[in-house]
Every structure is written in C-alpha cells, then in structure tokens.
A protein has these predicted regions:
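Peptidyl-prolyl cis-trans isomerase
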Residues: 1-163
C-alpha cells in the first residue's frame, strides 16, 4: 500500500537523520572524498621519455591535452580525449587521487608513476559537495545501513544455534 510505504520512508528518514544528529559535520568530513566529484583528463604511457616529451608539449601549447590523449595514451581514455568523470575521489588510483584532492582547475601535473604507467593528469573541474539536506540524508542512510548490518550480524551470532 502506498500510504504504508510513504509512512515507512518517512520514519526511516527520521531515524537516519537522528543518527547523524551532532556528528553530521564530522561524518561529512570523513566521507568528503566519496561526496566530492572531479572531472579530469589523463594520459597513460609506458615510456617515461615520451611522457616527459608530451607533458612539455602540452605545457608549451604545441599540442592540446585532447590531441595528445587521442594520439598517444595507451589506456581507454584515448577514445575520450583523456576525459574521466565526474567520479568521486575514491575511484582513481591513490597516486592520482592524492594529486586531484589538492589540484586547482586546469592544473597540469608532471608525469608520475601510477602502477605500470607514466601518467599525466589535469584537473578540469571540481564538483564540491555541500553539507545540505541531501548530503545529510545520504550520510544518515549510510549510517543506518551500517547500524542495520551490525545489528543483523549480532542477532545472527546470538541465535546461530537456533537457525
């Protein structure tokens, strides 16, 4: 029944919001990497020398990032002119993510090693999350899901001999 479902959703939302009362902002800061989004470009190469050459060519505007990615990148981003995203900051390789966290839009990074690749990245745009009602709901639902799983595991362990 629709009325029962709406009542259930309302109660669930109220419980979720009450769970984050008082700790919402610290929870927000803890999960900020999952809430913020970035749009960036990447070129992956197996040759360090070629990576350096392409980096300097992009930096001096001899070639655009998109042209370089299309022509030289050895990953799937060669089909998108290097574009990746928008993605949260937990999605990219940690070496890439750490640079994107502190980058300014249009900032080009010198080649660095990420796994087997020599990687060139440039942040295009950062979509900053805000601590608003939508974010509070997301965090509350996350916490409620975690608490529900914890309670479920506790009950299973307590009554496993009876199941």
């Amino acid at each position: 029944n629709l009325a029962e479902f709406a009542h259930y959703q309302l109660k669930k939302d109220q419980v979720a919001l009450s769970l984050i009362a008082g700790t919402g902002e610290s929870l927000y800061l803890r999960y900020k990497d999952r809430l913020d989004r970035v749009l960036y470009r990447i070129i992956r190469l197996s040759s360090e020398d070629l990576a350096q050459h392409i980096y300097y060519s992009i930096e001096s505007a001899e070639i655009t990032f998109g042209e370089a990615a299309r022509e030289y990148s050895e990953g799937p981003e060669s089909k998108t002119e290097g574009f990746v995203g928008p993605v949260d900051l937990t999605t990219p390789h940690p070496e890439i993510s750490s640079r994107l966290k502190t980058a300014n839009p249009s900032q080009l990074f010198e080649p660095f090693k990420a796994e087997q690749w020599f990687t060139i990245i440039r942040l295009e745009y950062r979509f900053e999350s805000e601590f608003n009602d939508q974010t509070k709901k997301f965090l509350g639902d996350l916490l409620l899901g975690s608490k529900s799983n914890s309670i479920k595991e506790s009950l299973i362990n307590k009554y496993k001999d009876y199941i």
